[in-house]
């Protein structure tokens, strides 16, 4: 018998996971929506962000510095990836994009394993958010509540960039018609570089925020990548609001199903994805956009 406090705790766990998936998926969806690149290395960006934050924390004992340093590292790595490798695959078949980004993902995982080993690493939560908080009817880890708030602020910042700045206007126009944007004299390749960097940074930032909740391992990006792609499909490719909505839905599905039977969490997640595709082939908030 499942008690109400346990059920509500699982709802909170689903909210925390959903917020994390929303942030990672928002980066992936704007990358694919703008650049048309299926980035299988996105999960590795999540993992590398966590490890970069771990290194920064080891030397500074500052969680804030760890977040800044880890996010900056992954953003720079994303920019370099776009300029050196990804740029040559914009007009190539998706199969080529999958192969090259899958290869990059394997390289990043093995590099992390070489430097950090296979044993898990952890970053403690910052002192103000350590311990547990009483919600009246139950106790809940303070950091998980804080993580939801931090990610919400990050999503709001990304929303403002996409919908309240000239760069965001160009990015959203590029999602609809990249050729039209280029015909207006805009350097789309510079925009692509910035978008890839922002998308990678979103994943890296999520990796650091998640580090005090789940241990860091070189393979941690693989499972999150699968969940992220499902979120993008549910929400709609290229849709930022869709990524947020899809992330929250996926988080609750995984959390609630895991409480009943952990073995069926992914089954239920893919079942919901299939149902969404049957009813709305372009996702809940997606449009036809890029083919």
Predicted regions and their residues:
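Membrane-interfacial amphipathic/re-entrant helices at transmembrane-helix boundaries
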Residues: 1-23, 52, 63-66, 92-98, ...
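Inter-helical junctions in multi-pass inner-membrane proteins, predominant
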Residues: 2-20, 161-166, 192-234, 254-264
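Cytosolic-side transmembrane-helix boundaries in multi-pass membrane proteins
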Residues: 6, 24, 84, 115, ...
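Helix-loop-helix "hairpin" substructures at the membrane interface of multi-pass membrane proteins
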Residues: 17-18, 138-216, 240-246
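Short, non-helical or kinked segments that cap or interrupt transmembrane helices
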Residues: 19, 26-50, 91-97, 167-170, ...
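Alpha-helical transmembrane segments within multi-pass membrane transporters and channels
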Residues: 61-105, 111, 245-250, 280-281
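Transmembrane helix-bundle core of multi-pass membrane transporters
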Residues: 88-89, 93-164, 191, 256, ...
């Amino acid at each position: 018998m499942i008690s109400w406090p346990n059920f509500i705790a699982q709802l909170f766990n689903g909210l925390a996971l959903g917020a994390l998936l929303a942030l990672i998926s928002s980066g992936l969806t704007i990358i694919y929506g703008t650049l048309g690149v299926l980035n299988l290395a996105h999960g590795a960006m999540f993992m590398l962000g966590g490890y970069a934050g771990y290194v920064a924390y080891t030397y500074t004992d500052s969680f804030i510095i760890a977040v800044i340093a880890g996010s900056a590292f992954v953003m720079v790595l994303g920019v370099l990836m776009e300029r050196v490798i990804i740029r040559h695959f914009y007009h190539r078949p998706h199969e080529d994009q999958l192969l090259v980004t899958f290869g990059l993902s394997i390289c990043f995982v093995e590099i992390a394993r070489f430097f950090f080993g296979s044993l898990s690493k952890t970053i403690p939560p910052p002192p103000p958010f350590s311990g547990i908080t009483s919600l009246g009817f139950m106790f809940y880890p303070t950091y998980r509540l804080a993580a939801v708030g931090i990610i919400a602020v990050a999503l709001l910042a990304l929303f403002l960039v996409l919908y309240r700045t000239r760069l965001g206007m160009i990015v959203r126009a590029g999602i609809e018609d990249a050729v039209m944007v280029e015909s207006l004299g805009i350097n789309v390749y510079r925009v692509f570089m910035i978008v890839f960097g922002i998308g990678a940074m979103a994943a890296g930032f999520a990796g650091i925020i998640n580090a005090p909740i789940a241990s860091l391992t070189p393979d941690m990006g693989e499972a999150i990548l699968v969940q992220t792609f499902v979120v993008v499909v549910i929400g709609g490719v290229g849709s930022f609001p869709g990524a947020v909505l899809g992330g929250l839905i996926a988080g609750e599905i995984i959390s609630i199903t895991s409480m009943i039977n952990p073995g069926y969490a992914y089954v239920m997640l893919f079942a919901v994805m299939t149902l969404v595709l049957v009813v709305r082939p372009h996702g809940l908030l997606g449009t036809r956009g890029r083919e």
